[in-house]
From Swiss-Prot:
Any one GO BP annotation for this protein: tRNA modification
Protein name: tRNA dimethylallyltransferase
Keyword Lipid biosynthesis: no
Organism of provenance: Wolbachia pipientis subsp. Culex pipiens (strain wPip)
Region (Interaction with substrate tRNA): 36-39
Physiological role: Catalyzes the transfer of a dimethylallyl group onto the adenine at position 37 in tRNAs that read codons beginning with uridine, leading to the formation of N6-(dimethylallyl)adenosine (i(6)A).
Sites annotated Interaction with substrate tRNA: 99, 121
Gene name in the database record: miaA
Description of how the protein assembles with itself and partners: Monomer.
Amino-acid positions noted as binding substrate in the UniProt annotation, renumbered to this chain: 12-17
Pfam family name, one: IPPT
InterPro entries referenced in this protein's UniProt entry, alphabetically: Dimethylallyltransferase (IPR039657), IPT (IPR018022), P-loop_NTPase (IPR027417)
Length: 297
């Protein structure tokens, strides 16, 4: 695609949604297209901080069932359709979100990792739950020595993914990542929002309390009433596992809030490192509102 496409990414709670609201007020010829792997799920709009549904401007938010094992490959198909529709209607596509795999697949192309079987996923998940962090890391390292220095002990999601891939395929995940399909776009601008850490951490803490006050607990209750598999992506959205533990009586509400805040801050910390290393051609902004002060198109 030869048309300019804008990608706005960055740390969780960095102000991407507020920025998009401001851009809509300033520019009427834009389409905001979601690039967050959890904001696609229609049953959890509060706990995933989805924007209000203004169909005129927002696309790919809250349109997938939490029962679905939605993937980056499916998202790329949906994204291509929405970008084409925007360009056809003389709108500027603004793709925004902070999911690392989605962003990487968008900019660098989708890796050709085969589908992982449900049996392998469940076995890896059981290992992750039953082993300590140190034991799980040593296990994955013994299966795939190439993770050393690339995937770290606290990154349980990437460790699980690495173990799934080498168990399913017999090849390290890095071999598959080195063989990618061509990216969808060849002409885009990338902006990465990286505010000060203390500002992000403060926003994470206050935002989760607001989510609880605005119905996140009822949202998770409704999610559980669907009896979804615990391995589905929607069940792993930030705050969902902690609220489930509260609803089961395992922890108090205050404990659930504190644990969710801590886990989300740890996630943001990993995002800082990831974004700084992944996209050297990106324009880094320390405050989202700065993007409304100069032309991003």
């Amino acid at each position: 695609m030869k048309d300019n496409i804008v990608i706005i990414t960055g740390i969780t709670a960095s102000g991407k949604s507020e920025l998009c609201d401001n851009l809509i007020k300033k520019h009427k010829n834009i389409s905001i297209i979601n690039c967050d792997s959890k904001q696609v799920y229609k049953e959890i709009p509060v706990i995933t901080a989805q924007p209000p549904k203004q169909k005129e401007f927002y696309r790919l938010y809250g349109y997938v069932s939490a029962r679905e094992n939605y993937s980056v490959g499916l998202w790329l198909e949906d994204l291509k359709r929405e970008v084409n529709n925007a360009l056809k209607n003389s709108r500027i596509p603004i793709i925004t979100g902070g999911s690392g795999l989605y962003i990487s697949s968008l900019i660098k192309g989708l890796s050709s990792i085969p589908q992982i079987s449900q049996e392998v996923r469940e076995n890896v998940n059981e290992l992750r739950k039953n082993l300590s962090k140190e034991e799980f890391y040593k296990l994955v390292l013994s299966k795939d020595p190439r993770i050393q220095g690339k995937i770290f002990i606290n990154d349980s999601h990437r460790l699980s993914r690495a173990l799934e891939v080498i168990t399913e395929t017999g090849k390290t995940i890095f071999v598959w990542q080195e063989n990618r399909q061509p990216p969808l776009f060849n002409n885009f601008k990338v902006y990465t929002i990286l505010p000060k850490r203390e500002d992000i951490y403060r926003k994470i803490n206050s935002r989760f309390i607001e989510m609880v006050e605005n119905g996140a607990i009822d949202e998770v209750k409704n999610l559980l009433s669907m009896n979804p598999s615990p391995h589905l992506p929607a069940m792993k959205a930030h705050g969902v596992p902690e609220i489930i533990r509260y609803l089961k009586g395992e922890i108090t509400l205050d404990e659930a809030i504190q644990i969710a805040q801590t886990n989300t801050r740890h996630y943001a910390k990993r995002q800082y490192t990831w974004f700084k290393n992944q996209f050297p051609n990106s324009q880094v902004i320390d405050c989202a509102n700065k993007l409304t002060e100069f032309g991003i198109f």
